[in-house]
């Protein structure tokens, strides 16, 4: 199972959520959202994505984190869902973020098992 690159953030997600919460509750100020442009993520990872796309084997299965953490219609990658952080910092997943990926891996393994 090959897992493609994950979107990453330039800021610590949990710290940013804390600051956002303080600004909104104490000062009624809106802090910027915690997301990145999908196009930026793709362009920053274009080389490795192209290399991974060239890999092909009947026993190679691919997981695309951008399908899990990015909204194609909004063209944004998210780092929190309903106030729950999916990343513990700029690049590491929280348990909630890891659960999303783990569920996808389990689903893929079950699909592979059912095909045999």
Show the residue positions of the predicted features.
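Extracellular glycan-modifying ectodomains
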Residues: 1-116
């Amino acid at each position: 199972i090959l897992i493609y690159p994950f979107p990453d953030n330039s800021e610590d997600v949990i710290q940013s959520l804390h600051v956002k919460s303080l600004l909104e509750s104490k000062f009624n100020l809106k802090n910027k959202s915690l997301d990145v442009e999908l196009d930026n993520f793709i362009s920053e990872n274009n080389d490795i994505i192209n290399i991974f796309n060239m890999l092909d084997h009947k026993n190679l299965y691919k997981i695309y984190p951008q399908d899990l953490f990015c909204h194609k219609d909004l063209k944004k990658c998210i780092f929190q869902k309903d106030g729950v952080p999916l990343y513990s910092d700029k690049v590491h997943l929280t348990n909630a973020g890891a659960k999303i990926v783990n569920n996808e891996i389990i689903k893929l393994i079950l699909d592979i098992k059912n095909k045999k």
